[in-house]
Amino acid sequence: MNIAGVVILYHPDIQLLSENIITYVQGLKKLYVYDNSETKTPGIEEALSKLHPFIQYHYFNANEGIAKRLNRAVEEASKNHYDYLLTMDQDSSFKVGDFEKYTSQIQAAAYTNVAQFGVNCQPNFTIPKEQPEEALTLITSGSILNVSLIERVGVFNEDLFIDFVDAEFSYRVVQNGHINLMFSNIILNHALGKLIEGRSLANFKKTLRITHSPIRVYYIIRNGLYLLFKAKGLNAIMKKDVLRCIKILKNDLIYNPELVSVYKNLFSGIFAFLSNKKGEK
């Protein structure tokens, strides 16, 4: 399979990053490693060079968001004539043999109208099935882009900076008559947020809750409101999906240990939406 990959970093743990990259790098012809950290992690270039000779590390001395790095990777993949591009987060990995299984399934079916392939990042909620299914959205990590169709879909929206970048792109895939295809039998090891224990206000039982850093609250509410009220072409199903994602913040508003900062970022994000502020906070 003529495929490159990109993994986007932000203050990575070198050991964990290396362990994750090993699970998919052998199936790639090139891996672009784009570092969004404000300060460079000592020893990272040396560590990456030992993993695979086809790894290219780039440090930008600034965090300019995930969308800009994804667009750079798509541009590089197109310029170097790769057919597909794997997009990964630094904390994501595949089970042994799963990445090879993933790419083999894509090759075997010779899909022509699929702009984006994805995997199952929530096996507790999405039951694995042998046959792939169309999806409204796919997360960035673990997705494989059909480079030839990106021009029709359009590039990733750099105004969003971080959150909803993958969802907004997925919506445009559908709007342009293409398909997001999920292989739910391929499980991605991926953390969607920080898990903390919280007591239910309904039955007082303690359960694990997904929370986010306060700055993520800012981007989730700002970008979510943008998609709901200002983005063009979103149908009712897409807007319902955006609302579902925004509602995830309820755990942060109740259980996040940094409540003061969470609420500051919430109101700051709402104000940013009202004042049409885009990009980085």
Give, region by region, the residue ranges found by the protein language model.
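Conserved donor NDP-sugar-binding/catalytic core segment of glycosyltransferases
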Residues: 95-129
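A conserved acidic beta->alpha catalytic loop
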Residues: 34-45, 92
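Short beta-strand-to-loop acidic/aromatic patch adjacent to the donor-nucleotide binding site
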Residues: 82-91
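A short, conserved alpha-helix in the catalytic core of glycosyltransferases
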Residues: 149, 159-192
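Non-catalytic, C-terminal membrane-associated alpha-helical segments of glycosyltransferases
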Residues: 228-281
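Short beta-strand/loop segment that forms part of the nucleotide-sugar
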Residues: 29-39, 58-60
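Short, well-formed alpha-helical segments that are part of the catalytic scaffolds
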Residues: 7-27
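Glycine-rich, basic loop-to-helix element that forms the pyrophosphate-binding segment
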Residues: 60-77
